[in-house]
A protein has these predicted regions:
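Metal-associated gating/positioning segment near the N- to mid-region
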Residues: 45-115, 132
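C-terminal cap of metal-dependent C-N hydrolases
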Residues: 8, 325-329, 385-451
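Divalent metal-coordination and catalytic microenvironments
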Residues: 8, 21, 26, 47, ...
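His/Asp/Glu-enriched, well-ordered alpha-helical/loop segment
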Residues: 201-232, 284, 305, 309-311, ...
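Histidine/acidic residue-rich metal-binding segments in metalloenzymes
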Residues: 132-311
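Short, surface-exposed connector motifs at secondary-structure boundaries
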Residues: 86-90, 116-121, 146-147, 225-233, ...
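Alpha-helix-loop-beta-strand connector modules within alpha/beta enzyme cores
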Residues: 102-118, 166-180
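Histidine-rich, glycine-flanked metal-binding segment
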Residues: 1-53
């Protein structure tokens, strides 16, 4: 059966254009104006924007953290992703300390296979470095994993500068790409100790012990290590002006640096941590913390100028009951917020509709660039002949109010509660099959594991 999406505006990384899309099976056959409806079922998308299926390259489903497990597993999290127009997620396989990379990959396949409703892949977390892990890197490429992650903070996961240098050298041999969580762990620990010694324990202590300059310091240190190795790296969830300055300096030196940010750093500000209602403030605890309005504006400018390549979510959801476990100890509040269900509508509302970015930029940061960065292009990330028929149908006139009660994810709150979006996602198609209709997730979708190639950006 052929499908003909007729009457819409197709959005690519270069911008919007009027075109029809002809689909057969799982693939796109043609994209051009006025395709005749011969032997095809017509999907009327008059007045709609048609995006490639969004790619969220930074999710944490079914993750054990802070003595609990994220509210969303791969089943609920992927359904929430589909509702938000995301047809592909890349989650993080996380071996426990002392385990092999194979152990971590095996566990994440057990969590996701047969449960994930959208297509999916994995990054591999490197939390240690030795000869065994170095040998395993080769095996990961054979398994379709071409991207990795390291942490400069969190005692259970962080890796030192020497190990990071050695790991990056190995990844350079293989043509791999690595994302790094950049915060200065030592200074954070000292600031936390100072707060506790002073008897301070409010949620506001979270951003005050993880300041922007200590994120920027870690970004600068990472980039100097990467410069020594001569390898491009990804700065994940970039939050502030100072970090952007470090990145700009590295690019001026001739380095290739890729930058990711997230909706929470674009549309929220740090006033959320100073709410007198402890639980309301705790809902926004994530690391790095949400920053100031000036940082939001700087990130939007960076997207517009092409200095930020991707907008992911760092989706790491918890219930209010789980957040309450940190009452009395701000460092024990589980860090993370839900985001996969609202990302596309927030970027359109606060970016495109407010004329901070264009439709082409929205397509680049949500679909095209993540596909290229993580070895999925042109199968994913573009509406073109031969690509997977992953299609997001966006109605720019169907405004709606974000409410936790309407969400399909497992968290019982939404950090954007009450926000009014300009337009909404009405349909989502995954490999030529409808998975969202009239804004509702349809049952029965089963995602495919996606082995990935090398970076193409």
């Amino acid at each position: 059966m052929r499908l003909l999406f007729k009457g819409g505006t197709v959005v690519t990384g270069k911008g919007p254009r009027r075109a029809d899309i002809l689909v057969e099976g799982e693939k796109i056959l043609d994209v051009c104006r006025d395709i005749p409806a011969i032997g095809a079922q017509v999907v009327d998308v008059t007045g709609m924007l048609l995006f490639p299926g969004f790619i969220d390259a930074h999710t944490h489903f079914d993750l054990d953290v802070c003595n609990t497990t994220t509210a969303d597993d791969f089943a609920s999290g992927s359904r929430a992703a589909l509702r938000g127009g995301t047809t592909t997620i890349i989650d993080f396989a996380c071996p426990n300390k002392g385990e092999t990379l194979h152990d971590g990959l095996r566990l994440w396949h057990e969590k996701a296979d047969g449960k994930c409703a959208c297509d999916y892949g994995f990054h591999m977390t490197i939390d240690d470095w030795n000869e065994t892990i170095a040998r395993e890197i080769d095996d990961m490429y054979a398994e379709g994993i071409s991207s990795f992650k390291m942490y400069m903070t969190y005692p259970a996961m962080m890796i030192g500068d020497e190990a990071m240098y050695k790991a990056l050298k190995k990844l350079k041999e293989k043509g791999g790409i690595c994302g790094v969580h950049c915060e200065n762990a030592g200074v954070i620990d000292a600031l936390i100790a100072e707060k506790k010694a002073a008897g301070e324990n409010g949620v506001y202590c979270h951003p005050e012990t993880r300041p922007d300059i200590m994120e920027a310091e870690a970004v600068g240190r990472l980039l100097r290590i990467a410069e020594q190795v001569d390898i491009p790296v990804v700065i994940v969830y970039t939050t502030n002006i100072e970090a952007l300055d470090e990145i700009a300096n590295a690019r001026w030196r001739g380095q290739k640096v890729f930058v990711e940010t997230c909706p929470q750093y674009l549309v929220l500000d740090d006033s959320v941590y100073y709410n007198e209602d402890w639980l309301q403030a705790a809902k926004y605890v994530c690391s790095p913390p949400i920053r100031k309005k000036a940082d939001c504006n700087a990130l939007w400018r960076a997207i517009r100028r092409g200095e930020v390549q991707t907008v992911s979510t760092d989706h790491c959801s918890f219930t209010t009951a789980q957040k309450l476990a940190g009452r009395g100890n701000f460092t024990a509040i589980p860090g993370g917020i839900p985001g996969v269900e609202t990302r596309g509508e927030l970027i359109y509302t606060f970016g495109v509709a407010k004329k901070k970015i264009g439709l082409g930029a929205m397509c680049r940061v949500l679909a095209e660039n993540p596909a290229k960065l993580y070895g999925l292009y042109p199968r994913k990330g573009v509406l073109a002949p031969g690509s997977d028929a992953d299609i997001v149908v966006y109605d720019p006139k169907a405004d709606h109010v974000i409410r936790a009660e309407d969400m399909v994810g497992a968290a019982d709150y939404n950090p954007y509660e009450g926000f009014v979006t300009k337009g909404s996602i009405r349909q989502v198609w995954l490999r030529g099959k409808p998975v969202v209709s009239s804004g509702k997730v349809l049952p029965g979708s089963v995602g495919k594991y996606l082995p990935r190639g090398k970076c193409q950006l």
